[in-house]
Amino acid sequence: MLELEHRFRVVDVHARLNADAGGVQTRGRAISPDRLEREMHQAGVVRSVVFPGPREGGSYVSANNAVARRSVDRPFLAFARINGPRDPGERASSRLRNLAARRKDHHTSPEDVEQYAYDDRFHGFKLDPARDGLPDEETLDELEEVGLPVLVHGGEGFSPEAAEDALLSRSFPVVLAHFGGHPLNRDLMTEAIDLLERNDACYLDTSYVRYRDLLERAVMEHPDRVLFGSGAPSSHPNVAVMEVLTLDVPEDAMRKVFDKNARRVLGDSLPGDF
């Protein structure tokens, strides 16, 4: 694919790296870290947040460490994937189960969070509550203590309302992926945009959003709270960048989406002169 030509530096806050196979995994094919790096370069992406894909049961410690190793000497920022014992559902039965939920050995503990936070290979956390469960209160307390950003899969299995109830009372930055509406749920995406009015530490990433009117509304109403996410490898970075480049928004707002807002969230993880 041809390289995109544009005048923006792009930071991508959403790319998946398969730890077990040594490559990035999408349905039916695997892409190596080198190929992911090339595709990011083609799209003008200068830094990419990467995290391991899901696994059935078990701890994410080895997968996180593998992603961190494969990020060395590449323009990747490793996020540690975390899990927990609590059911993210909004029904009364879920709340009842959570009263008796206890952390097991394979769940992320406060000690794990502390270790990740003070390992300079990791720059934040990835959480998919619908697949991996929610951390318990002690682990959330430690996430709040370390203060690193948490990228949260948002959608039909974990709605913006559920994210607000479970996470947004905390002080750490929350980046709600997919505008909180995966897969392509306009109503949930609209709820997530409205959520920004009430929660100063909440941000949205653009991965898999596709709806131009919702993207433009969020960028125009909340220009400091929208971050670019490619969703690679399921979406090619070129395609994801073009979706933002073609929005009818001011250039300064576009620059915030591509670069400046990520700097606010990632802080010292991004060098000032890259």
Q: PLM features: residue spans?
A:
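Divalent metal-dependent hydrolysis catalytic cores, especially in the metallo-beta-lactamase
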Residues: 15-16, 27, 34-58, 76-83, ...
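Conserved, mostly hydrophobic/aromatic
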Residues: 14, 40, 67, 125, ...
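Mid-to-C-terminal alpha-helical segments outside catalytic/metal-binding sites
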Residues: 1-17, 22, 29-47, 238-274
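Catalytic pocket-lining loop regions of alpha/beta-barrel enzymes
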Residues: 132-228
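Generic structural signal for well-ordered alpha-helices
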Residues: 33-37, 64-68, 110-114, 140, ...
